């Protein structure tokens, strides 16, 4: 089992200026800092005794057989990226703050999941690569 945690963040100004529709025309800037509240991701291989291949627990629970049936977009895309089409995997998300808090929870969850899932593959990525992959997934794949 792999457990990772990623901090939430507070943006002081510039919200929305990190979207391509804005910064390609107007430039963008965000000043942000992490806080001492975290998102946690646990990832483990499931024994092959279940009728599903993927169990995902966040504010919903998913039990699905095929990766393309996963409703949680970032987790689906991360599993595809690391080629987890044949393994039985469980991803469990928990956090110190509720969803929709406005403190970057979805980005924290994506970054944390990339870190944990890459570690399961023994393909640890540096912080810059994790950040670029998270941006690609959130802005281009979804």
Segments predicted by a language model, with ranges:
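Alpha/beta catalytic cores of group-transfer enzymes, especially the acyltransferase/condensing modules
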Residues: 127-142
């Amino acid at each position: 089992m792999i457990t990772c945690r990623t901090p939430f963040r507070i943006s002081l100004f510039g919200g929305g200026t990190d979207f391509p529709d804005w910064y390609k025309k107007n430039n963008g800037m965000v000043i942000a800092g992490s806080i001492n509240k975290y998102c946690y991701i646990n990832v483990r291989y499931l024994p092959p005794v279940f009728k599903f291949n993927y169990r995902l627990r966040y504010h919903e629970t998913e039990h699905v057989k095929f990766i393309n049936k996963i409703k949680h977009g970032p987790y689906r895309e991360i599993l595809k990226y690391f080629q987890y089409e044949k393994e039985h995997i469980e991803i469990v998300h928990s956090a110190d703050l509720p969803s929709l808090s406005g403190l970057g929870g979805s980005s924290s969850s994506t970054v944390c999941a990339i870190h944990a899932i890459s570690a399961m593959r023994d393909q640890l990525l540096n912080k810059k690569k994790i950040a670029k992959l998270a941006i690609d997934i959130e802005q281009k794949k979804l």
